[in-house]
Each structure stands twice: as structure tokens, then as C-alpha cells.
Amino acid sequence: MECFEGIWQFVGVSRAAHAYLVRGTRRTILIDTGLPTSVAYLTDCLAGLGMTPADLDLVVLTHEHIDHAGAAPMFARSCPVAAHRLAARKIALRDEFTMMNKAFAADLENFEVDLLLEDGCRIEAGGVSLHVLHTPGHCSGAICLLEPGRRVLFSADTIMASGIVGGVLGSGNVADYIATLERLAILRIDHLMPGHGRISSNADDDIAVGLKRLHGLLDDSQALFATLRETGRGFDDMMRSLRELNNF
């Protein structure tokens, strides 16, 4: 589906994240790749636009979770892959816990991230500029990509329509997540291109709702620790629960 001129959404299937194609006058960029099983589907999506994976100039991963990075090894055979340095480190070390492999019952083939991104980097496609925002919270190496000309944010799992947040998993934490959404709240953003769910043109409202949910999550975690203290359960019980986080 073409969302804006030169921007297409490839809707994720079977729990895979959405992928987005950005086509400028000089470069064609794929944002996220879904699960390892998404290879054939994404190849078909490209074919529908008269393209093959070899026509891509760059793949950008918004973070290391396997539902976003799973098909990257196939695309890495013909074009460079970019990610935030923290995400790239987890991919290089095959950190299966933070990459959520077990949660998706999938394994990620070895591949290298070629380009390390930092906050403030710009990816120029020719007529389209993507500004890299480091947005930790959902995980430590998460990024969003801002296309300022049309006020479009490729928000991945950081913030989605109706204020849905992607959860605090693996390397994520609530405090960073709140700081990230506070930062996004002061930017000029109209449209969210999320990793899951529908596209939204109410970015300000979505971010505000997401912030409320995160503050609620912080309050809930404080209440949980208070309950553990009251019932005599300690840190070891909490750690046993955390070890199961990647096995649901």
C-alpha cells in the first residue's frame, strides 16, 4: 500500500512487523524486514513494484527484535544493513534473549550490520531525508526515523496508533521509554508509521496516551514491589519471573 508518494507499507503477516519502502531519486530504502519467514512475502511485495531485493540500496533496522530483523540476512546478501550501534551489538553477539527469538519460536541466521547509526544521523534518499532518532525504552537500541517534510515518523514499536506502546522487554526500561515519548511529544509529527497495527494521523494524541500508559506501568511496578515486600517474597522470586519473560 502506498501511504505517501514514494512511501509504501508492506503489512506484516504471522506476527511479523510491518516493513516500509522509501523510494527517493537516488536511493531505495527498506525499513525493517519482519520475521525470517517473511522473505518470500517481502520479495513478492517488491515484485509488485517491479523490483527485486537487489534493487534495494539500504536496509534499516529499527531495533534487534526478530520480528523486525528476521529477514535481514537475505537482504544483507545484496545491500548494506544499518542499525543503531546497541542493536548491532546484540545482533553480532546473537543475544537471543534481547532479540526475542524464543518468543517468536524463530532463529536468526548470522549476518552483519554494516552501518552503525547514532542519534542525529541523516539518511538521504534523494528528495526524501530520514532523520535518525535514538528512542530507547522498548529496547536500548531502538530508533525511529523522522521524515520532516511530511512530518512522518517511522515509529516501529516505540509508539503506535491509539497510544499503544511496545512493552518493556529485554534491554528496555520504563524510565528511558518515558523520556523518549517526552522527546517525541515536542517534535513536529503528524503521522505514525508503526511496526504493528494501523497507520495513524493523530500522532500528538497517540504520544500523549502512550505517556499516560507508561506512567501507569511505572506506578504498577512500584505497587508490585510493595506487594512483594508485604508478602515476604523477595528479589529471587522476581528474578525467576524475569527469566521466563522470553519464554512466553
Q: Which functions belong to the PLM regions below?
A:
Residues T37-A40, D44-R122, G216-D219:
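Active-site HxH/HxHxD metal-binding segment of metal-dependent hydrolases
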Residues L49-A54, I123-V128, P148, I186-L187:
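Glycine-rich phosphate-binding loop signature in dinucleotide/nucleotide-binding domains
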Residues M1-L49, C144-A156:
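Conserved beta-strand hairpin/beta-sheet module of binuclear metal-dependent hydrolase folds
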Residues M1-W8, N101-A105, G126-V128:
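Short Pro/Gly-enriched beta-strand edge/turn motifs at strand-loop
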Residues P36-T37, S129-A223:
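Metallo-beta-lactamase
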Residues M1-E5, L21-R23, A40, D57, ...:
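A structural signal for the main folded, soluble domain(s) of proteins
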